[in-house]
Amino acid sequence: MSVAFAAPRQRGKGEITPAAIQKMLDDNNHLIQCIMDSQNKGKTSECSQYQQMLHTNLVYLATIADSNQNMQSLLPAPPTQNMPMGPGGMNQSGPPPPPRSHNMPSDGMVGGGPPAPHMQNQMNGQMPGPNHMPMQGPGPNQLNMTNSSMNMPSSSHGSMGGYNHSVPSSQSMPVQNQMTMSQGQPMGNYGPRPNMNMQPNQGPMMHQQPPSQQYNMPQGGGQHYQGQQPPMGMMGQVNQGNHMMGQRQIPPYRPPQQGPPQQYSGQEDYYGDQYSHGGQGPPEGMNQQYYPDGHNDYGYQQPSYPEQGYDRPYEDSSQHYYEGGNSQYGQQQDAYQGPPPQQGYPPQQQQYPGQQGYPGQQQGYGPSQGGPGPQYPNYPQGQGQQYGGYRPTQPGPPQPPQQRPYGYDQGQYGNYQQ
């Protein structure tokens, strides 16, 4: 065997032709087979000899490929032939793989490599999600694509929730809404983390990118929420279950995010969430806490706001959403009804002052909402109007806290209505 292979190899050196190279590749396949057979039989001496021969052939082919690029064009097809053997041969023939990688790489490495990256991207996007996040930065669209699919998968991963935040890119937002829907549902489990990620990311990313877009989303989305509010309710419920979970769990994040952005992004979700919250039994339960405590919880949470700073954000967020949202909704509803959503927000801020820490956020709301406020009006209008039904109960700004409960009730009812 060694002689047979050696001769062709020597001839190949003299004859750099496609036929000679192809024959050498065939010989390499035979060598790989022989190596595998010898390994299976435990003939280490023969295996080592074959490996050395194979390594020599690969080095020679690599040299030819380097000297003659045309050979590379010829090699790719053959390498694929070698590749099948490659896995066994490469693993088994330690030395050859490097040369092989040199020769084969175009096929094996490249073919394998790129797929791996794609695989990784998908894997990362889906599994790691964090990679997604990086990816997200690079390719929101891809992320959206990935997120769409990833969210679906990620939804299972929940990290996707975080990846919704990847979705959060405003582009994602629509998807996010949808994805959130999908994710939110899956995310419900992961919701907290996703929301944590999402909210932070969304808040930041969306706030950064979409804030308006989110708001646009809200506007569109708000409308979507109005139209989609049921979905939002679902999303909110799902996501917001997550958000709720995420909100409370995320609260730490929110607080950072309490910067209105995330709250906004969150708020969208939170609006949906809160609506969903309302929609969601737990949120309602929590909201119900708000309900029973609702006013108290409002007061409670307001106190707890300081305490629950984060939970406040969420609950506050909820309250922001409810209070803030409701206030925003109620106020914003008022604001929505009245152009003064921001005015509503200032009241919210005023309310928030009671809530403490919100004023800034509320301020964030005021300003951000000022922008989004109009957009939120979509929410409020959609939901606000729904709240509007509730507003009658909320009519007095004094009620904002009540509106908050109403917000919850409304949010919940909003969800129900939605």
From Swiss-Prot:
Entry's localization field? Nucleus
Annotated region (2 X 13 AA imperfect tandem repeats), positions in chain: 344-369
MF terms from GO for this chain are: transcription coactivator activity
Tell me the first and last residues of the signal peptide: none
- UniProt lists compositionally biased (Pro residues) regions at 394-403
Q: Which UniProt keywords apply?
A: Acetylation, Activator, Nucleus, Repeat, Transcription, Transcription regulation
PTM annotation (N-acetylserine): residues: 2
Q: Name one GO cellular component term.
A: nucleoplasm
Q: Where do the record's region annotations for Disordered lie?
A: 76-118, 199-418
Motif SH3-binding covers 392-401
In this chain, composition skew of type Basic and acidic residues spans 309-318
**Whereabouts are the sequence repeats?**
344-356, 357-369
Per the record, the GO terms for biological process are:
positive regulation of transcription by RNA polymerase II
Extent of motif SH2-binding: 50-53, 374-377, 413-416
Q: Where is the composition biased (Low complexity)?
A: 199-211, 225-251, 328-337, 345-366, 376-393, 404-418
Pfam families for this protein: SSXT
Q: How does it assemble?
A: Interacts with MLLT10. Isoform 1 interacts with RBM14 isoform 1. Isoform 2 interacts with RBM14 isoform 1. Component of the multiprotein chromatin-remodeling complexes SWI/SNF: SWI/SNF-A (BAF), SWI/SNF-B (PBAF) and related complexes. The canonical complex contains a catalytic subunit (either SMARCA4/BRG1/BAF190A or SMARCA2/BRM/BAF190B) and at least SMARCE1, ACTL6A/BAF53, SMARCC1/BAF155, SMARCC2/BAF170, and SMARCB1/SNF5/BAF47. Other subunits specific to each of the complexes may also be present permitting several possible combinations developmentally and tissue specific.
Primary role: Appears to function synergistically with RBM14 as a transcriptional coactivator. Component of SWI/SNF chromatin remodeling subcomplex GBAF that carries out key enzymatic activities, changing chromatin structure by altering DNA-histone contacts within a nucleosome in an ATP-dependent manner.
Q: Which family does it belong to?
A: Belongs to the SS18 family.
The name on file for this protein is: Protein SSXT
Q: What is the lineage of its organism?
A: Eukaryota, Metazoa, Chordata, Craniata, Vertebrata
Instruction: List the gene name.
Output: SS18
